């Protein structure tokens, strides 16, 4: 009813005839004809209110003085929360995993230790064969209109009939029901072997270690496609191409079949992954009275096969050297120096290796005589560090993998065709994809940290305070100011500077009163980055530039309000404004609204301020803990699904707030959204602060209640511990966004919803 009212109002506001007839509007209001004029809640029809999850884990450890072992096995079974309306198969988002790990440590001699570790997992994911990624699947569900069909009636898929409904006949079942299903099985194996040899006979405290690791993955995807018949409801009197039984009611609703149920087809695909890692190191630790020294020299190398890139057949390799020296005097004065020397395939031989040093120091004041044995201050340490790290990876925006061999031109790119000469036919061919840059080198990040660690009141209160500053330079990026028209992509350059600074606070209170122990942990962090330099097209309007703003800062138009007759100083909007249309600010005062009026609006999608609070207690076998997390100074730019009522094609869904918050003559003083219109969509739904929403939230992330049993029979059977518990995840959320999960940085688009999980469990140890 709201949808029909809104759409009719939009057409009326634009001086056009309403789309829905009075009969249809009244039927929606009264629900008097739910087959011809349905009002379907697709979320209720498609989703269960809950789905089961089962998890188990078994750990076994033991051994002798020289041989020790640890074995772990686990399983996880998660059922999807889609309702299965097609009983021919299960098309839900189910997930099943079995994981295992076995560790074996052997002391071959008093100075020789061999560690053999093996682990892995087997996973199976079941999914509906919709042909879309998960976001697009949920986007289509959001798009479904309530009158596009009644859904499943008497086991039949009933779709809306355009004879009676003028728009919006893509229903919520269309992209998931009767289309088949798929399953992906993944098998991952992780192996590593480490040998540690003490070399005290060379010099005391010296040891040599060598480690090799091998990881392998294989996946097999099976897809089974099919189709299913659907039906359209008709009044019998409108089915003029068929004969009807004598005396039948002309207003009776009959179903006319559309399509046939198809056979299930089969397709499969395979994937694989493989990588190895090796390192060799000398490690030395030695004490000379109150002087404590250590040193490390390490070589590492890795290779990844079948990487996600333009060259999956060429393995990706890394090689590096690491050095570290530490010194402390009487656990009072501490200093550490590190160096890294790493090589990457992405740079030319002259720039392939990067040198990355770091140094840190600390002073434990409570080791000094003036603070030692202080009744209030149990521990106090100040520290500082400075270091440089490197990055060699460039991820083009919108791609799922990183570019490789950035110093070389991409040799070719298969094109869809080219028209040679005067002919009109397309000829296949290849062309150079992008330039290389032989002068490219490592992106660098210089990091500083200054902190204080403390413990007070007999260690009841402890915590740390940190200030950090980071400056990224030589950022890997492509130029955006080159005015020349190129036939291929520009090369990656060392282009860009970004700074980041912030503070972190961690506080812990832990106290015991007789049998009652309680604790609380608080952590708060604030960080803000800024683009110091970015290759931008120069503009006389500095407020349009990204330089000086955080990375990912949204830009758009500032909103003055909604238009009303007699409104003064209104710039040209390239559209004749009507009452209830959005009016934007003309920031450059040139009398027109365009991209030169766009400025920074809202915050980036990542929060600037994060916080977490843990509370808990233990008392005579009972234990309780809960974790609250929150964030603020973060925004989401709503995409078309959440922004535009009726969508781009004017026949998609209408969200409830888009109806209740719209401008009307009666709500002009309180309206939050523009009037219902079709003609004014281009103006009203431009990128502006109207569609940047506060994504601050407070969430009860985790809560756990448990009880440890101490029963007489337990020692008799070798049972050391038995605990029952209940845990809950994502139980409560307080936020202003409402339409999606505020904790997800992509919550401005439709996505698989966050799950509220409640577990009951038993933990037994022997």
Regions from the language model: what does each represent?
Residues 78-119, 266, 645:
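Extended hydrophobic/aromatic segments used for targeting, binding, or gating
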Residues 1-32, 130-131, 135, 398, ...:
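Conserved small-residue
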